[in-house]
Swiss-Prot record:
The keyword Kinase does not apply. GO terms for cellular component: cytoplasm. This is Imidazole glycerol phosphate synthase subunit HisF. Heterodimer of HisH and HisF. Belongs to the HisA/HisF family. Keywords: Amino-acid biosynthesis, Cytoplasm, Histidine biosynthesis, Lyase. GO terms for biological process: L-histidine biosynthetic process. IGPS catalyzes the conversion of PRFAR and glutamine to IGP, AICAR and glutamate. The HisF subunit catalyzes the cyclization activity that produces IGP and AICAR from PRFAR using the ammonia provided by the HisH subunit. NCBIfam families: hisF. It comes from Dehalococcoides mccartyi (strain ATCC BAA-2100 / JCM 16839 / KCTC 5957 / BAV1). Disulfide bonds: none annotated. One of its GO terms (molecular function) is imidazoleglycerol-phosphate synthase activity. The gene is hisF. Its EC number is 4.3.2.10.
């Protein structure tokens, strides 16, 4: 069984890490390079950076952030937020990212997934899906959770895999930033249908929440932000807890 991964998520706006609730009410959480270095020391398995302003100007700033981080941190870096083209992907991969994450652009241009996988290898391409529960299913939203697409989240995840995605980053908009646990029904519905890893995101408030996403939700990895940014738990504490519950995780010596 592959190790379960614990991945801090850093939302970057104007070169600073921020955190909100259900994608709004942003507050400052620190310097991206300092936070990344701290998480690396604490035993993070990977880091995800999401550029939430994603203007052209900000893309340059983001590439600079990635370049600095890649000199301090020697674990995989995934970067996303507003990527619309192979050129955008190339900029970030050249700056030092190991993977790129596409969201809104993949919905409007699904072939971008295939083109990216063909050029860089599918292990590089992460498709981020922001899903909101509607009755017994989940709808995909784009543009930072503001725009409904009419797409079913489970079906879209399956299609993304067929198109060449190497991983799915699955965020519950309903749970995001509330620290009350992940939507594990959503996680399980998607994970059980795919042959590629699913990263569960949105709702982490405690080590138990991360365990439930990996166990009940059948996710391969868990993404969390505020529980780490504000020092509520360290990555080492979380991983020791997961290990004590019998999950395979990589512990620092």
């Amino acid at each position: 069984m592959l190790n379960k991964r614990v991945i801090p998520c850093l939302d970057v706006n104007n070169g600073r890490v921020v955190k909100g609730t259900s994608f709004v009410n942003l507050r400052d959480a620190g310097d991206p390079v300092e936070l990344a270095a701290r998480y690396y020391r604490e035993g993070a398995d990977e880091l995800v950076f999401l550029d939430i302003s994603a203007t052209t100007e900000e893309r340059k700033t983001m590439a600079e952030v990635v370049e600095k981080v890649s000199k301090e941190v020697f674990i995989p870096l995934c970067v996303g937020g507003g990527l619309r083209s192979i050129a955008d992907m190339t900029t970030l991969l050249r700056a030092g990212a190991d993977k790129v994450s596409v969201n809104s652009a993949a919905v409007s241009d699904p072939d971008l997934i295939s083109r990216g996988a063909e050029k860089f290898g599918r292990q590089c391409i992460v498709v981020a899906i922001d899903a909101k529960r509607e009755g017994n299913s989940w709808q995909v939203y784009t543009h930072s959770g503001k725009k409904p697409t009419g797409l079913d989240a489970v079906e879209w995840a399956m299609k993304a895999e067929q198109l060449g995605a190497g991983e799915i980053l699955l965020t519950s908009i309903d749970a995001d930033g509330k620290n009350t646990g992940y939507d594990n029904e959503l996680n399980r519905e998607v994970s059980s249908r795919l042959n590629i890893p699913v990263i569960a995101s949105g709702g982490a408030g405690s080590p138990e929440d991360l365990y439930n996403a990996l166990d009940k939700g059948q996710a391969d990895a868990v993404l969390a932000a505020s529980i780490f940014h504000y020092g509520r738990y360290s990555i080492a504490e979380v991983k020791k807890y997961l290990k004590s519950k019998g999950l395979p995780v990589r512990l620092e010596n």
